[in-house]
From Swiss-Prot:
Protein family according to the UniProt entry: Belongs to the chordopoxvirinae O1 family.
Membrane topology designation: Single-pass membrane protein
GO cellular component: membrane
Protein name: Protein O1 homolog
Keywords: Membrane, Transmembrane, Transmembrane helix
Keyword Membrane: yes
Length: 656
């Protein structure tokens, strides 16, 4: 057994508890240690520069008035869209942020500005109405005039939906609206449509765009004409079994319910479901219902059930005895109750730390969640309960037994102590491109795969990785659980990705006459904000996420190469595994002697890989071996090599 946190971190947590969870009363060295280990929520001003230096996202832990404008601008520019947690700090600094055109783009895209802000932006000539419409049409000031050329320009650079949203807010001539409809098939949902009094033209437009609310913009004189009402009824009937809510709403204001029911028959109850008229079973003879009516009822069975369960039950019996079965879900599905533990997530669980028993369960389930300190401090519990929870947290231990490799505990304890220092960072890209130009692809044989492995691991040591090494969704290994709000390792994403493991999906194993895409990038240059939701970045911090991504990519490299080799042949797999482990350790500058210390049962691994490929069974033994290898690598990178896991390949004896 070993402690989850180092001795110094445990001491800092105890000091924090004695201070009553007050960072102001804590010695600065202990406060910094807690910040490094992600145990904080709100911070006093004295830690600003230190916290910002670790991770720019940490500035959100300070009061809005403390946050420096330049730091806020840098953070805003890194994010594709601003989440709700930025609302207060942006409100505090909005006056100064609105003077920067690039920042204004982000604020408009994220709906973080009001109409009064938009007026100031236009008055100060930061943005024009057209530029605002290109970013977010819903923020254009109502009544703003737009010419035909401006509307066309917006359509060409955005989409038809954006133009339709723009129509709700702008003033533009009717000829512009009709031109855009004729040339680009953009629905004329604009107030100027009331100028059109040609009934045939209006009917044509409604038929062409039945799902849009064109009828709301039609001239009242046109609507009052009898032939117009009859045409709308015809359009509604012709569209069945599809429903046009806008047309249905309007026609229900023109005709009384009884007349509508007589006009539409059994369709009435679904077309006008908001009209409170009972559905009596004796009003309709099921034997007289047509095939189209039956399909319509099946499609909207839920609406009919709300009107009358008796009608629906009788309808089901009618279908049953007539031996009529339809693809729609008409008959209730029989479900069987399964006994399973209710899945819960850390954010919801830590809202209430009611008692010590609950606390023990939560801390045990989520002890490998790097944001657990934040969740404890951010809970609604009293300070006494939070202090008890932190006291339990600093006493958490990790089991060093082999079997416990599966719960990621060992790897987690190694990663939180790991401080990455990139080697030969300067000009790495030029050297990499030069190497890749000479070695554009690798052969799909043992020599080619092992040569590729040497290249991958030696570049990974420098922090240079390819997160799209396999052409599938990136970051798919089970290690990503370490930045997931779950108490169990989820293998779903991993198993989905393994279906795509084949030589054709490895960029560097393609035919020699094909060009390859060089996706290698230093881990510091990877745009984490595009890969992950910002809530996770804010919780776990950029630095820890990069550590997990590095470990994840190493796992993906090794596992993918093993599968590729096994798919080609299982002959002499033991020798290949030995050399692959050797190349991996050597690439990270770790003593090659350690590759003889990995215990593997070749027969078990072959059976696992066969089950994975054919039956999609999780390969737990292979997963465990790779976990041991990762722990060995990061222990050595941490400067700890005394107690590395022993991994030796054996053909017959099972030791894992």
């Amino acid at each position: 057994m070993a402690n989850l946190y180092s001795k110094k971190v445990r001491k800092s947590i105890r000091k924090f508890i004695r201070s009553g969870l007050n960072f102001d009363l804590l010695h600065e060295k202990h406060g910094r240690r807690l910040i490094i280990n992600n145990i904080f929520v709100k911070l006093p001003p004295k830690y600003y520069n230190f916290a910002k230096g670790l991770d720019l996202n940490n500035i959100l832990a300070f009061d809005s008035e403390i946050i420096q404008l330049n730091d806020l601008k840098k953070l805003i520019m890194r994010l594709p869209l601003l989440p709700d947690c930025f609302t207060d700090v942006i409100s505090c600094h909005k006056k100064y942020l609105l003077s920067d055109a690039a920042i204004v783009n982000k604020l408009i895209n994220s709906n973080m500005v009001s109409l009064s802000d938009i007026r100031n932006i236009i008055d100060n000539r930061i943005k024009t109405p057209v530029e605002i419409a290109l970013l977010n049409s819903s923020l254009v000031i109502p009544g703003t005039p737009f010419s035909l050329d401006e509307v066309k320009y917006i359509f060409e650079n955005t989409s038809a939906e954006n133009v339709k949203e723009l129509y709700k807010r702008i003033e533009t001539p009717i000829h512009s609206v009709l031109y855009m409809e004729e040339k680009f098939s953009i629905s004329p949902v604009h107030s100027s449509l009331y100028q059109v009094t040609d009934v045939d033209k209006i009917i044509y437009l409604i038929k062409k765009y039945p799902d849009d609310d064109i009828i709301d913009y039609v001239n009242g004189i046109v609507k009052s004409k009898k032939d117009f009402i009859e045409s709308i009824i015809t359009i509604i009937k012709d569209r069945l079994p599809d429903i046009s809510p806008c047309l249905n709403k309007w026609i229900s204001t023109q005709l009384p319910p009884d007349k509508l029911r007589d006009e539409f028959g059994i369709y009435f109850y679904a077309l006008f479901e908001w009209i409170d008229i009972p559905l009596y079973i004796d009003k309709y003879l099921f034997l007289n219902i047509t095939e189209d009516e039956t399909k319509f009822i099946c499609r909207y069975i839920d609406i009919y059930k709300k009107k009358s369960e008796l009608f629906v039950n009788a309808f089901r019996w009618h279908l049953y005895y007539c031996n009529s079965m339809y693809p729609q879900k008409v008959f209730p599905v029989i479900t069987y109750k399964q006994d399973s533990k209710e899945k819960y997530v850390v954010k919801e669980s830590f809202k209430y730390l009611d008692n010590k028993q609950t606390m023990k369960v939560l801390l045990n389930d989520f002890k490998y969640n790097y944001a657990i300190g934040k969740y404890i401090l951010d809970s609604s519990s009293s300070n006494e309960v939070k202090m008890d929870a932190l006291n339990m947290l600093q006493k958490q231990v990790v089991c060093l037994e082999n079997a416990k490799c599966f719960d990621l505990g060992n790897l987690y304890s190694v990663l939180i102590k790991f401080q990455y220092h990139p080697v030969d960072y300067v000009m790495y890209s030029d050297k990499l491109l030069d190497y890749m130009s000479k070695n554009s692809t690798f052969d799909n044989n043992d020599i080619g795969l092992l040569t590729l492995a040497s290249f991958l691991f030696s570049t990974a040591k420098k922090g240079i990785i390819d997160i799209n090494f396999l052409n599938t969704n990136s970051l798919w290994s089970p290690l990503m659980y370490l930045i997931d709000d779950s108490c169990k390792v989820d293998f779903t994403r991993f198993m989905m990705a393994t279906k795509n493991i084949k030589a054709d999906n490895i960029n560097y194993l393609k035919n020699k006459d094909e060009n390859i895409n060089n996706n290698f990038e230093h881990i510091d240059n990877i745009d984490i904000y595009k890969l992950l939701d910002y809530s996770r970045i804010k919780l776990y911090g950029i630095n820890f996420i990069k550590k997990v991504i590095l470990a994840n990519v190493i796992f993906e490299y090794i596992f993918t190469l093993i599968i590729i080799r096994y798919q080609k042949t299982s002959y002499n797999l033991r020798s290949f595994l030995e050399m692959l482990l050797y190349r991996c350790l050597k690439g990270f500058g770790i003593s090659p002697k350690l590759y003889k210390n990995v215990y593997v049962n070749e027969m078990n691994i072959c059976c696992e890989l066969e089950n994975l490929i054919n039956n999609y069974v999780v390969p737990f033994k292979t997963y465990g071996i790779l976990m041991k290898l990762l722990i060995t690598i990061f222990n050595n990178l941490n400067g700890i090599s005394k107690h590395s896991f022993r991994i030796r390949v054996r053909k017959s004896k099972t030791l894992l």
